[in-house]
């Protein structure tokens, strides 16, 4: 133990000597180095921030309402390229009771660049959401509904709860001091840095071309989501008004020949757009002419006509 401490002290002394030499020989490089370390340290310590919240349902093992908070966190590594896996971090499920409502909340974090890129591309945004849902299913052995919608609020629950969940913050100061006293060694500080993206679960966003070196599971994900060319179905979109010609709702009728069940349809609605997908058959994405109330949106499937009707009240 004593020799280990001496060895560590020697390494620290050598490191400071190198910094002193650098400061004397090349002050500009020394300044850049210090600024870079401060920047990386700040990013490493930065807390996750809520980006958007999804509502869906857990079907198995027990049916429950589920909210997924998608957060941006600089501590999560960014993917090396468009064909590399996308790292993400998933917090533990938390069951929350509010009066008569009981629901589950799961926090998911991506690197900020990943979410910002998805905000500009609805297709990538949907892929990112569905990959997060798939990762949740695999990690917790859940079966989730294929349908989801983006809520009006960015986070379900408090920001403090989300930070504690993702960052593992201990709220008891005495426990935190004891943990630091027992575990805060230089080696553990080094190992806790997030320079290695293997520490996080990773998924691949589908691209037209995927590297042959990608893992088998990732190749399967890509092949099922991008290599099948889906048709754009015929549809009718109209705004329904009242007797005074005041717009009330948007009604969308979509013809889906060959589809005989609503369970085959994936429907995603936000205030400004709608996405309808039928696996390996149809895909329809539309920007809506008016903002709609996602919580009051309804959908029904007329089996005889193979037609999906979505009714979206205006905000």
From Swiss-Prot:
GO terms for cellular component: cytoplasm; R2TP complex; ribonucleoprotein complex. The lineage of its organism: Eukaryota, Metazoa, Chordata, Craniata, Vertebrata. CDD domains: ACD_sHsps-like (cd06464). The gene is PIH1D2. It comes from the Eukaryota. One of its GO terms (biological process) is rRNA processing. Belongs to the PIH1 family. It comes from Bos taurus (Bovine). This is PIH1 domain-containing protein 2.
């Amino acid at each position: 133990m004593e020799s280990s401490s001496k060895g560590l002290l020697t390494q620290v002394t050598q490191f400071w000597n190198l910094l002193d030499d650098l400061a004397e020989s090349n002050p500009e490089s020394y300044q850049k180095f210090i600024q870079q370390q401060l920047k990386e340290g700040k990013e490493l310590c930065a807390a996750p921030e809520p980006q958007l919240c999804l509502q869906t349902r857990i079907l198995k093992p027990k049916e429950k309402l589920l909210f997924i908070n998608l957060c941006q966190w600089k501590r999560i590594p960014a993917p090396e390229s468009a064909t590399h896996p996308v790292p993400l971090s998933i917090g533990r499920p938390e069951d929350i009771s509010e009066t008569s409502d009981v629901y589950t909340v799961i926090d998911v974090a991506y690197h900020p660049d990943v979410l910002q890129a998805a905000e500009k591309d609805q297709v990538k945004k949907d892929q990112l959401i569905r990959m997060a849902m798939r990762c949740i299913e695999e990690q917790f052995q859940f079966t989730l509904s294929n349908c989801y919608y983006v809520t009006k609020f960015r986070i379900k629950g408090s920001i403090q709860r989300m930070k504690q969940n993702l960052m593992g913050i201990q709220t008891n100061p005495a426990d935190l001091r004891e943990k630091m006293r027992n575990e805060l060694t230089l080696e553990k500080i080094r190992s806790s840095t997030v320079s290695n993206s293997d520490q996080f679960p990773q998924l691949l966003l589908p691209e037209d071309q995927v590297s042959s070196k990608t893992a088998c599971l990732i190749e399967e994900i890509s092949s099922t989501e991008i290599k099948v060319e889906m048709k754009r179905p015929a549809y009718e979109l109209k705004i329904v008004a009242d007797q005074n010609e005041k717009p009330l709702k948007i009604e969308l009728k979509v013809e889906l020949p060959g589809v005989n069940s609503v369970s085959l349809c994936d429907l995603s609605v936000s205030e400004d757009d709608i996405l309808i997908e039928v696996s390996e058959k149809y895909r329809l994405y539309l920007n809506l002419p008016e903002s709609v109330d996602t919580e009051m949106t309804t959908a029904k499937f007329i089996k005889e006509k193979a037609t999906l009707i979505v009714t979206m009240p205006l905000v």
